[in-house]
């Protein structure tokens, strides 16, 4: 199977800072004085992780909170760069990494559809042609013309996934943003992801819901303590993970 995601010996580090200022005025007027880089101190998000994902595969990243799953998705999506190693992808990548990502809080849901869909590679005419399908999928009703600053987290998830549902990516990347939606909408999203898979779209996503992983995924990548622990079939890795978490 031809790999369309190649994650090769990737390490991502972030510098650590500590607060040495005396109060909020220092933060506003003297930010350089208020924060000081802890020389030599870094946070290691992931370390020497390698994996590939083949064209048309559905793969889940699992692991404890803070293990490095979301960092890995961000690297594949291209929103962050590795400290070491290389990350390459082939084709159009559509990602939903955080609630409200790619949206402007002062714009309405409808206006944000134009904004987000454009960021995902659709032309304005294509957005217009798909607008009603996006709105119908979102189930937001009259709220579609309200500014999204009044939206709940569940409504933001609905809007974001509704746009994703109408793009035509080669690679679909989803962090665990679906967990905030209602059960019926979650089921609709899972079915949409399965439909993407049937059409040959490559899927990489993070989930703590092993039932969803089993429904969608061919393989699972288990990240533990910022390193790759296991890669294998969904059934085998999920069983190992459940045993480790027990």
From Swiss-Prot:
Family assignment? Belongs to the ABC transporter superfamily.
Q: Does the keyword Repeat apply?
A: no
The uppermost taxa in this organism's lineage are:
Bacteria, Pseudomonadati, Pseudomonadota, Gammaproteobacteria, Enterobacterales
Pfam families, from UniProt? Answer: ABC_tran (PF00005)
Q: What is the protein name given in its UniProt record? A: O-antigen export system ATP-binding protein RfbB
* One GO term of the biological process aspect: polysaccharide transport
Instruction: Provide a GO CC annotation, any one.
Output: plasma membrane
GO molecular function per UniProt: ABC-type transporter activity; ATP binding; ATP hydrolysis activity
Q: Which SUPFAM superfamilies match?
A: P-loop containing nucleoside triphosphate hydrolases
Q: What is its main location?
A: membrane
User: Where does the protein end up?
Assistant: Cell inner membrane
Could you confirm whether the keyword Transport appears in this record?
Answer: yes
């Amino acid at each position: 199977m031809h790999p369309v995601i190649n994650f090769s010996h990737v390490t991502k580090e972030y510098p650590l800072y500590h607060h040495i200022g005396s109060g909020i005025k220092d933060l506003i007027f003297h930010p350089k004085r208020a924060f000081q880089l802890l020389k030599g101190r870094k946070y290691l998000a992931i370390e020497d992780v390698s994996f590939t994902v083949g064209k048309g595969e559905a793969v889940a990243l699992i692991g404890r909170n803070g293990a490095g799953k979301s960092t890995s998705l961000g690297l594949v999506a291209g929103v962050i760069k590795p400290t070491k190693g290389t990350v390459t992808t082939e084709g159009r990548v559509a990602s939903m990494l955080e609630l409200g990502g790619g949206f402007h809080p002062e714009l309405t849901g409808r206006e944000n559809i134009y904004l987000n869909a454009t960021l995902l590679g659709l032309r304005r005419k294509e957005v217009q042609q798909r607008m009603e399908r996006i709105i119908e999928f979102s189930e937001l009703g009259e709220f579609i013309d309200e500014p999204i600053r009044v939206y709940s987290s569940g409504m933001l998830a609905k809007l974001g996934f509704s746009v994703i549902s109408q793009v035509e990516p080669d690679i679909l990347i989803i962090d665990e943003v679906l967990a905030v939606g209602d059960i019926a909408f979650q089921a609709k999203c899972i079915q949409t992801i399965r439909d993407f898979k049937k059409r040959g779209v490559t899927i990489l996503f993070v989930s703590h819901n092993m039932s969803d992983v089993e429904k969608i995924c061919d393989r699972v990548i288990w990240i533990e303590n910022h390193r790759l622990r296991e890669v294998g079939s969904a059934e085998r890795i999920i069983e190992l993970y459940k045993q480790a978490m027990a």
